[in-house]
Swiss-Prot record:
Species of origin: Hordeum vulgare (Barley)
Coiled coil: none
UniProt entry keywords in alphabetical sequence: Seed storage protein, Storage protein
Family statement drawn from the similarity comment of this UniProt entry: Belongs to the gliadin/glutenin family.
Protein name, entry field: B3-hordein
Role according to the record: Sulfur-rich seed storage protein.
Tissue expression pattern: Developing endosperm.
């Protein structure tokens, strides 16, 4: 066997691949043109307001004194009706209308020594009321007042003694508390038309000689004042009869509380 002659293979030279010339990418930068910030300042024109001079202040008129502003009742000046309910709401809170026993003024004048005796420190009534006195009356003065009271009290009719003692006690208590009495006025129909509505003062008709109507007085008191008044009256009704040896009825002719008014 003849060996197969191997022809040498011709090696084809590999041509080097010419790389395509890469065109350099030239960056095309966009020219960033800076925006010129031109501040446009607004011209601040100061607005000068014309200064107007203020008008000269007029001095306030001097008001007259307070006592000259008060209306005189004798001149029949109308008074404001709006102030009356307001004053009643402020003052009349839980007030009870108490009827004061009415006796003839001559009887009260006759029992004036008894009233003075009850007002002094030598009386247990005055001690219960704790009336402030700078000095105590002498024993001789108390003895004189006691004798005068015991001389006048028996001269009053027995059926009027109870109301008389209560009347002087009421006058003492009301005088100490500086309360204003509210007196009812009963007027005939003929003279009632003479009153002017909205007026501060009015003329109280004088009762005729044949018709002398005695209207009892009344006053508005608080509950604790009523209790003090009852206690004082009870002491006086026990003190004067024992001191003067005079019979004084302990019953009441007129009820104490006749009406109740409650303030808003």
């Amino acid at each position: 066997q003849q060996p197969v002659s191997r022809q040498p293979q011709q090696i084809i030279p590999q041509q080097p691949q010419q790389p395509f010339p890469l065109q350099p990418q030239q960056p095309q930068p966009f020219p960033q043109q800076p925006i010129p910030q031109q501040p446009q300042p607004y011209p601040q024109q100061p607005q000068s307001f014309p200064q107007q001079p203020f008008p000269s202040q007029q001095p306030f008129p001097q008001q007259p004194p307070f006592w000259q502003q008060q209306p005189v009742l004798s001149q029949q000046q109308p008074c404001t009706q709006d102030q009356t309910p307001l004053l009643q709401e402020q003052q009349d809170q839980m007030l009870v209308q108490v009827q004061i026993p009415f006796v003839h003024p001559s009887i009260l004048q006759q029992l004036n020594p008894c009233k003075v005796f009850l007002q002094q420190q030598c009386s247990p009534l005055a001690m219960s009321q704790r009336i402030a006195r700078s000095q105590m009356l002498q024993q001789s003065s108390c003895h004189v007042l006691q004798q005068q009271c015991c001389q006048q009290l028996p001269q009053i009719p027995e059926q009027l003694r109870h109301e008389a003692v209560r009347a002087i006690v009421y006058s003492i208590v009301l005088q100490e508390q500086s309360l204003q009495l509210v007196q009812g006025v009963s007027q005939p129909q003929q003279q009632s038309q003479q009153q002017q509505v909205g007026q501060c003062s009015f003329q109280q008709p004088q009762p005729q000689q044949g018709q002398q109507q005695q209207v009892p007085q009344s006053v508005f008191l608080q509950p604790h004042q009523i209790a003090q008044l009852e206690a004082t009256t009870s002491i006086a009704l026990r003190t004067l009869p024992t001191m003067c040896s005079v019979n004084v009825p302990l019953y009441r002719i007129v009820p104490l509380a006749i009406d109740t008014r409650v303030g808003v």
